[in-house]
Amino acid sequence: MSITKEFDTITAISTPLGEGAIGIVRLSGTDALAIAQSVFKGKNLEQVASHTINYGHIINPKTGTIIDEVMVSVMLAPKTFTRENVVEINTHGGIAVTNEILQLLIRQGARMAEPGEFTKRAFLNGRVDLTQAEAVMDIIRAKTDKAMTIAVKQLDGSLSQLINDTRQEILNTLAQVEVNIDYPEYDDVEEMTTALLREKTQEFQSLLESLLRTAKRGKILREGLSTAIIGRPNVGKSSLLNNLLREDKAIVTDIAGTTRDVIEEYVNIKGVPLKLVDTAGIRETDDLVEQIGVERSKKALQEADLVLLVLNASEKLTDQDRALLNLSQDSNRIILLNKTDLEQKIELEQLPDDYIPISVLTNQNINLIEDRINQLFFDNAGLVEQDATYLSNARHISLIEKAVQSLEAVNDGLALGMPVDLLQVDLTRTWEILGEITGDAAPDELITQLFSQFCLGK
């Protein structure tokens, strides 16, 4: 997609393909009303009031054949998502009918929209900035209510406001430095001394570092915790997965080696999305298929944010158990002693003190797993403070880290006694980096790449 503004009219199906109660085909652009009217039998859409819903039929203009009975929403620029004329045709849900209407609109002069092009136009037309555009996709992808809360707040402009206010303060500081350099005799502007610049720079740095401290929590809530369930065969890993999911997704049998691959599922644990990875039991095996599963399990363990190590409390520790304890000791790990409903034989004195005795069969202490996760990753604090602004996007986090580094360079220069005017470069770089977050200074290639990740029709 070109970054220059385009004024042709685009169209796409905005609802998931498949059967459903309603399907929506969207148009945006100067000719949206005229194109929609050319296939609509009902009120004249070019004459109806903005933000109205109009009953009628979509027809094939060449044959007069009725395609579907519809409700058509008409929204006139600039009070629309794209700030262009927007028409949304609400059809009966179904692949055939929505595709037929889409093809009619294209034949009448609309262009098939590219992924994310409606939101891209909202960005190019000043309706949203880049952080708000990204928040749209975060809302769509949110797996828990906490993740959605963060995304909605970002869409509302909380992060944008904070970044823009900081950029303005940096710009004011740069302007003050420039005035001091170009007009040293101008007494109405406070002199930007080394001490004053250090104070301002530290203030900027403190604010950005405070924002960075929200990144761990925000990123977890946005992307989820990659959680590997490990243990030797037949200790209850798949049963634990099913218990957490509240449904049977993994194959549970008494035969060692029945989980031959890595099974991934998402589950909501008190607002935290866990990407649960049920791994094949890690053991030595001659079975080629199972060997592949074991290797994938080891890889999943290395990449996991959280490890749930399941041991069988009704049996003594084996060499495989001890190997897994060693293998996972440097991970964020929760040790689970399963099958406590049976006679206990495991040697507790050989285990770390922080294990949790559970019974997947009777549901004993499963809730303690959730509490331990909160303790490990959130220091027992609440997951989301209602009025707080969170960093959750990896791109934003990386740019804030770079901005902090630029401010550190300013402070280092001040400590070395460098003149204030020579430190403008790093301060200007900080201002530019923060502009990349909101899109004010983002490269065209980045903007194109970001919007290409959106779904069609959004």
Curated annotation (Swiss-Prot):
This is tRNA modification GTPase MnmE. Residues 224-378 form the TrmE-type G domain. PANTHER family: TRNA MODIFICATION GTPASE GTPBP3, TRNA MODIFICATION GTPASE GTPBP3, MITOCHONDRIAL. InterPro entries: G_TrmE (IPR031168), GTP-bd (IPR006073), GTP-bd_TrmE_N (IPR018948), GTPase_MnmE (IPR004520), MnmE_dom2 (IPR027368), MnmE_helical (IPR025867), P-loop_NTPase (IPR027417), Small_GTP-bd (IPR005225). Exhibits a very high intrinsic GTPase hydrolysis rate. Involved in the addition of a carboxymethylaminomethyl (cmnm) group at the wobble position (U34) of certain tRNAs, forming tRNA-cmnm(5)s(2)U34. Its EC number is 3.6.-.-. Binds 1 potassium ion per subunit.
